[in-house]
Amino acid sequence: DGKPWDSYPTEQIARDLRFFKYEPGAKWHGFEDYGPDQYFVDPCKFLLTTPGINIERGEYEPFGVPAGILAEYLRENGIVPEKADLNSILFLMTPAEDLAKMENLVNRIAHFERLLDANAPLSEVLPVLYRNHAERYRDYTIRDLCQELHDYYREYDLKSIQKAMFRKDELPRRAMLPQAANYELVRGNCELIPLSEARGRIALEGALPYPPGVITCVPGEVWEGVVLDYFLALEEGVNRLPGFTPELQGVYIEKDPDGRRRIYGYVLTRERARELGLRMGFGRGIPD
């Protein structure tokens, strides 16, 4: 109708499905390759986006508030979000929610915004995080932390890598079936190596980073391309900003003797790959 979404009364929004449609080409969501009336916003999911990305241009702004920082603040104040991505945070609405809980959530977010505007000391905003990593974040303010984490996202362009991981032409090559890869893992035909040394090697476990919470390298696929780049970028973040380690499944964070934390994964041994005659296609063999 040409009017802002929030100018309509709540009662009308609740009854009219138009308010929940993903319109193809709309700038606010950035999704592509779907048709009219194909997808709708789930009214039971309360999704907030945090500052840091220009929605119209899809580019990083000079300053941002990574959702993980807001999520940490809420957890330290007794509110557990369902999920926090790079610049979005999700809450699930259930029949158990009441007005008091919603008001508490809104009040906490508003208080966080006031602390951000005042550039309060990090020790006051996130006392648990600060206590656990006092040496790393000594004398930091909340905006200092937001800026550093935002700059890391921007340096590695994590939003673009995350999006590219699920494009068909960026998916890892499959060298063997997932079941066959699992058999090789169970039989011990594997080695645990840093992902920084895994390019071209065959994964034997499915690797799932959270965010986005989806398996990105299936057993039997080759560690390569943007999927490997994403995990290596996460590894850099683990070392730069302690306290914001993402949840990872199928790969393992280990501390090296030099103190650096690295992400490791199980891969098929080169000897076993050659025994199976795996050349991994596209004219490229098992790397030496």
Where are these regions (language model features)?
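Non-catalytic terminal extensions of PLP-dependent enzymes
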Residues: 1-288
